[in-house]
Amino acid sequence: MKRKICKALICAALATSLWAGASTKVYAWDGKIDGTGTHAMIVTQGVSILENDLSKNEPESVRKNLEILKENMHELQLGSTYPDYDKNAYDLYQDHFWDPDTDNNFSKDNSWYLAYSIPDTGESQIRKFSALARYEWQRGNYKQATFYLGEAMHYFGDIDTPYHPANVTAVDSAGHVKFETFAEERKEQYKINTAGCKTNEAFYTDILKNKDFNAWSKEYARGFAKTGKSIYYSHASMSHSWDDWDYAAKVTLANSQKGTAGYIYRFLHDVSEGNDPSVGKNVKELVAYISTSGEKDAGTDDYMYFGIKTKDGKTQEWEMDNPGNDFMTGSKDTYTFKLKDENLKIDDIQNMWIRKRKYTAFSDAYKPENIKIIANGKVVVDKDINEWISGNSTYNIK
């Protein structure tokens, strides 16, 4: 929030130094706002690979949903590049990084970073946007669902690069931007058209084995990220040759395309079969995705909280306070809440609420537009609010 002025200024100074050291934005793979570039190539090829690899015994429902996805291909491409242009994004793209060995982005692992650490990572963003995509798909909102799926695949592509899973930023190395440019200029020669097998063979069948979506997604991403990180140290740093970089781009871009095909395959099976990733599972964390109204002065600098009450009468409440400015007019903010009781099921939670508390005597009102709560990879609450919340107030969302 804005009241965190000191560390916000530190973060701004870091952002300034980062931009000063790079001639372009700090992307992992390149992507243009119009849905072109390396990220768009990856998702386009991912769909093409899956189509080429479909075995004859794939269910008709999966084939039908693949056709719907293809009809919305431009939305997939737009979603795949959007996170690099999102006005709500962190200035240093902290949530586009994820070290598969530490489970952190560079805001926790890199010694030069002195501002508030960012809890979101490239890996957690994959799961969040995948959950939103499944939710909208199951409601028949295919265009929005495909855009969300594209966003998920953007982050998947990011953590497959050599630099992002190694938590090497443009502050750490000029190679970050140079390698991205190198790959973008040669991306056509790195396209692949198959994962090397049909969907009734091991690579694809293994993808469907673990019904726990969150656990599967994290470990699936980890495998590809580990390859990317390893390639950074063996072939993609500034000390390596152009031939090394060519090898690094070839391997990691092929992995991005193959991995994307596999992830989309899992998505299509989940929506085709109506799989519920939350059934019978304990809830260890809740993810809130809050949209603030675009109406003038809808944002707030007051303290904001999220709380729950379980059927046994116990309550838990968290402050919602991301580094930098959140709850701004038109913003979309994400918060992750760890539950004290890890034995809870989602049905054990009786009530949920958001609460506003004055920061000063002269409080400003706040107008949230919508809040979605995600548990175990499923949207469990979708609440349209569109009401002004004034003073010290509580708004029940469940």
Swiss-Prot record:
Disulfide bonds: none annotated. InterPro entries: PLAT/LH2_dom, PLAT/LH2_dom_sf, PLipase_C/P1_nuclease_dom_sf, PLPC/GPLD1, Zn_PLipaseC. Residues 284-398 form the PLAT domain. Keywords: Calcium, Cytolysis, Hemolysis, Hydrolase, Metal-binding, Secreted, Signal, Toxin, Virulence, Zinc. Zn(2+) 1 binds at residues 29, 39, 158. Belongs to the bacterial zinc-metallophospholipase C family. This is Phospholipase C. It comes from Clostridium perfringens (strain ATCC 13124 / DSM 756 / JCM 1290 / NCIMB 6125 / NCTC 8237 / Type A).
